[in-house]
From Swiss-Prot:
Succinylation at Lys-280 inhibits the hydroxymethyltransferase activity. Desuccinylation by SIRT5 restores the activity, leading to promote cell proliferation. Residues 1-29 form a transit peptide. It is found in: Mitochondrion; Mitochondrion matrix, Mitochondrion nucleoid; Mitochondrion inner membrane; Cytoplasm. Residues 30-49 have a biased composition (Polar residues). The gene is SHMT2. This is Serine hydroxymethyltransferase, mitochondrial. It comes from Homo sapiens (Human). Changing residue 98 to L: Abolishes serine hydroxymethyltransferase activity, leading to oxidative phosphorylation deficiency.
């Protein structure tokens, strides 16, 4: 019986990491000698990772090779530039700096003050924001802490919020809870009510959202998604917020790069607060940003007195000291690098290509008879509903993983199981960073379709998900088909360049 092995030792090594692997073998063969040498000399801190920890170095090589030979379709992933990675792996990791520029609790912060202020300026410039009307906090460690900081700043415990339901394409931090448990910290500390998609169109049901808001009276409504392929009507959501006197938070984590490039509408005209991650379509290091309105909010018609926004101090206090300690200065620097890149014509071209590639992928899937939630895409992703095909996202994800295509299972409207949801989420940003074009994505869909068909055949022969996964590895004919498909996928993928470092 032929077993379909996924172990690294069974994989041929090509391109990414070949020379380094040779060095690793030499290091392993001389491990005893190296250890003896290390014992005889003092630690300098200048030892390379490959010298001081060959085991970890090899794991990095394996991951680098996986990325080079695979097709990365997870919509929330991208490939960071070498320049940003250099900042991320710099001496800035050494500096602790609780507080804000000019108001630190530690000395020696004059340089990191400049770095943080530079990141703030670039963040405002990237989204064409007037610093008199908008401010930004660049210290959140990622998107989820950024959202929690906003809730902490604007709400009291048990205040009410509304966000898109997770099975309909929302995010955990927008208040998700199941029938039996409050899943997200947002739903634990606050009272949440989801809004949903129209089941017929797959679009956000703004009319129902408005009706629900009138009854629920939320203090905060979140305009943001994690698996929604269409544009958000921020103006409509602003109307709802004004009617019920709620704040509007736009979570643009998935689409911030597209917003910066001006290829899709911006939420800043309508939102009170905007949060984002920095590693998705923005293509930076993993971190978070919180933008907030400042300046004059309104003028009292009776007294003529200017009424200012009060977000700045509340948000800054929520980030530090309420929720975080010292900022990750290395990440802030790397984000600043990415924000500079986001202001270039080249980044706009990249973002336009992301949209073209996503649409090409959607069209190719539709041509092959696949059902897409909402029927297509206006942004960087598509959500495939596999239920009409007779398959689920968990089985499709596993088959594709075995042939070096990385995607993720995802709930579709009406799904009741997060373990075997009906959807498969596919994104264009990462492969577009590897210079894929429309025809390349049509080829990718060919590979996906072949994998799904294998999955359908195996599903007809197995019962439970675990049986399905076991059959993929142990059935000789299936293993051979998967191995053949994987070889073609990897040969195709390796022909494209990879951003970042060559070796890791």
């Amino acid at each position: 019986m032929l077993y379909f092995s996924l172990f690294w030792a069974a994989r041929p090594l090509q391109r990414c990491g070949q020379l380094v692997r040779m060095a690793i073998r030499a290091q392993h063969s001389n491990a005893a000698q190296t250890q003896t040498g290390e014992a005889n000399r003092g630690w300098t801190g200048q030892e390379s990772l490959s010298d001081s920890d060959p085991e970890m170095w090899e794991l990095l090589q394996r991951e680098k090779d996986r990325q080079c030979r695979g097709l990365e379709l997870i919509a929330s992933e991208n490939f960071c530039s070498r320049a940003a990675l250099e900042a991320l792996g710099s001496c800035l990791n050494n500096k602790y700096s609780e507080g804000y520029p000019g108001k630190r609790y530690y000395g020696g912060a004059e340089v990191v003050d400049e770095i943080e202020l530079l990141c703030q300026r670039r963040a405002l410039e990237a989204f064409d924001l007037d610093p008199a009307q908008w401010g930004v906090n660049v210290q959140p460690y990622s998107g989820s802490p950024a959202n929690l900081a906003v809730y902490t700043a604007l709400l009291q415990p048990h205040d009410r919020i509304m966000g898109l339901d997770l099975p309909d394409g929302g995010h955990l931090t927008h208040g998700y809870m199941s029938d039996v448990k409050r899943i997200s910290a947002t739903s634990i500390f606050f009272e949440s009510m989801p809004y949903k998609l129209n089941p017929k169109t797959g679009l956000i049901d703004y009319n129902q959202l408005a009706l629900t808001a009138r009854l629920f009276r939320p203090r905060l409504i979140i305009a943001g998604t994690s698996a929604y392929a269409r544009l958000i009507d921020y103006a409509r959501m602003r109307e709802v917020c004004d009617e019920v006197k709620a704040h509007l938070l736009a979570d643009m984590a998935h689409i911030s790069g597209l917003v910066a490039a001006k290829v899709i509408p911006s939420p800043f005209k309508h939102a009170d607060i905007v949060t984002t991650t920095t590693h998705k379509t923005l293509r930076g290091a993993r971190s978070g940003l919180i933008f907030y309105r400042k300046g004059v909010k309104a003028v009292d018609p009776k007294t003529g007195r200017e009424i200012p926004y009060t977000f700045e101090d509340r948000i800054n206090f929520a980030v530090f000291p309420s929720l975080q300690g010292g900022p990750h200065n290395h990440a802030i620097a790397a984000v600043a690098v990415a924000l500079k890149q986001a202001c270039t014509p080249m980044f706009r071209e990249y973002s336009l290509q992301v949209l073209k590639n996503a649409r090409a992928m959607a069209d190719a899937l539709l041509e092959r008879g696949y059902s897409l939630v909402s029927g297509g895409t206006d942004n960087h992703l598509v959500l495939v509903d596999l239920r009409p095909k007779g398959l689920d996202g968990a089985r499709a994800e596993r088959v594709l993983e075995l042939v070096s295509i990385t995607a993720n299972k995802n709930t579709c409207p009406g799904d009741r199981s997060a373990i075997t949801p009906g959807g498969l989420r596919l994104g264009a940003p990462a492969l577009t960073s590897r210079q894929f074009r429309e025809d390349d994505f049509r080829r990718v869909v060919d590979f996906i379709d072949e994998g799904v068909n294998i999955g359908l055949e195996v599903k007809s022969k197995t019962a439970k998900l675990q049986d399905f996964k076991s059959f993929l590895l142990k059935d000789s004919e299936t293993s051979q088909r998967l191995a053949n498909l994987r070889q073609r996928v990897e040969q195709f993928a390796r022909a494209f360049p990879m951003p970042g470092f060559d070796e890791h």
